Structure formats: structure tokens, C-alpha cells
Amino acid sequence: MSGNESVVNYDHFIDKRRVRKAFERAAPLYDQAAVLQREVCDRMLSRLEYIKYMPDVVLDAGSGTGYGTCKLLERYPDASMLAIDIATGMHHQARQRMNSMIPRWRQLFGVGRNQRTSRVRYVAGDIEQLPLEDSCAGLVWSNLALQWCNDLKKTFDEMRRILKNGGLFMFSTFGPDTLKELRQAFRHADDYSHVNRFADMHDIGDMLVHSGFATPVMDMEYITLTYDEVISVMRDLKAIGAHNATGARHRGLTGKNAWQKAIGHYETLRTGGKLPATFEVVYGHAWKPAPRTSILTPETRRHIGLE
């Protein structure tokens, strides 16, 4: 796929209503299973150490339960924060997290409550269609949320729209090898899609350029989690709301025979008594360039026929 194309494969089309419901259900216990999300967030934060830039407004796009939001507030103590998520239940958990960071005696007497919480505005919405005005943020931060977008090019256009000139877009998402073991296991079981599809790092970089971003920097790494049983992999995915929401998914329950075939194939991958679950994590950042200004005077432009 070329970077300037915007094509949606409806077999891989993500049902946003299903995604929202999954995250609403997952919100209360999300943090118990979101080990990978926190780890990737911390690795993104370490990358920020090398970028000397102080935004006045930060957008956490796909803010979840607020782990990254709190970290960004600490890093940018003078910035205000916009936290957008598709599930309002995630915002409820984020507010609880924020309040838990205030000492109990301060909560009882109302001292210091507004010093942190008043800097955060929670917004319910889809990051593919941001309900925000143009040029409102200096930094757009998105940790493991872009994989839920149907049209990445459109999403990048939105990120550029709401960024201020000279602003930074920093993100992580999943690459094609994510959950490759699970995908291969079910490929031996039936013809349905059981794992969402993920964009290639190089395609993502191309789309950033075609969306008007400057100097994109991309890299990736593999992170492998290990489990005792296949069912534990599925439970963790369910606990973080990571259901398969594509159009090609099975609309009913996976049959017993298909399930047993999938388990049997997955078991052949057991190493050292553990089953692997691989995640290809793609990192990227790019800048919204300032508009180009002509060095030609109006008189010169008229003289050479440009006006």
C-alpha cells in the first residue's frame, strides 16, 4: 500500500461499537492485566528524554486508565492535558488514579486537589475523528491506541490538524507480527479471523509523510510475554479489552473442535515449559512543520508572474 492511499479492507474493518463496549467492560480491572501497556509507555517516556521540547498543551490520544496521563503531567508540570478515550469507563478509572495520587489528608481538606486534576480535561471520543479544534495541542501522545483505527492516514491527518505548528506527534502501536503464535494456531483451526491486522512500520512512516509530517523517526522491537496455558493468553487479551473486532471474525463461539486444534498447534510452541505471546511494538515520532514562507517580496513575485 502506498502512503497516500486510504483503503479500508472490510474483512479487517474494526467495529468501533464493539471496541467501545469491550473497553467499557474491561475498564474496572484493566490495570491488573495491562502490564505490556505500562511497559511500552515507560519506554516511550524514556525516548522523550532525548527530545528537548516543552509543550503547553498535551493530548493523550487513547488515554485509557490514565497511567500515561499522570506520567506526562509529572514530566510537563506547566502543561495542561487533554485525555481522550473512546470509553467513558476508562475516564472514570483515570480520575480515580489521579485522586489516589493526592495524599488522604489533602483530599479531606480539599488542599492540592486542583493543582493536578484541574490541569486535565477528559474528552470522550474517537481518535479517528477528534472532537477538538485546530492547532490546540503542542504534543500528541498515543500509546498503543492506533491499532484500533480503521484508517491510519485519516487519523494522522487529524493529529496534524490539532497540532500546533512545530508540534510533536509521538506514538506506539502494534506491528504485523503481534500475536503471531495465536494467529498461526487458529489458522490451523478454521478460516475465520481471530486476531486484528496491524500495519507495517514502513507503511506507517510513509503515511506520516503523506499526511504532512516532517522528519518521521520509526523503530520497532519485539516483546514476548510467556504464559502457562493458551487460555491465559485469551483471558489477558479479554481483560484489556483486546477482542478481535474485525469484520471477518466468527460471529458465534469458536467450536470445540476448532478450539482444540488451535490449542494443539499453540502447544507445539511451548519452550521451557512456557507458551510465548509475541508483540511487535512500533514506535514513531514526527513533527508538524511550520508553514513555508516565501523570501520573495510581493513586488518581486508580481514581476516574475507569481501574482
From Swiss-Prot:
Q: Which PANTHER family match?
A: ARGININE-HYDROXYLASE NDUFAF5, MITOCHONDRIAL
Q: Per its UniProt record, what InterPro entries does this chain match?
A: BioC (IPR011814), Malonyl-ACP_OMT (IPR050602), Methyltransf_11 (IPR013216), SAM-dependent_MTases_sf (IPR029063)
- Domain of life assignment: Bacteria
What family name appears in the similarity comment? Belongs to the methyltransferase superfamily.
Q: Which GO terms describe its biological process?
A: biotin biosynthetic process; methylation
Q: What's one GO MF term for it? A: S-adenosylmethionine-dependent methyltransferase activity
Q: Please state the gene responsible for encoding this protein.
A: bioC
What is the reaction catalyzed?
Answer: malonyl-[ACP] + S-adenosyl-L-methionine = malonyl-[ACP] methyl ester + S-adenosyl-L-homocysteine
Q: What is this protein called?
A: Malonyl-[acyl-carrier protein] O-methyltransferase
Note whether Protease occurs among the keywords.
Answer: no
EC category: transferase
Quote the EC number.
2.1.1.197
Give the pathway: Cofactor biosynthesis; biotin biosynthesis
Against Pfam families, the record matches this protein to:
Methyltransf_11 (PF08241)
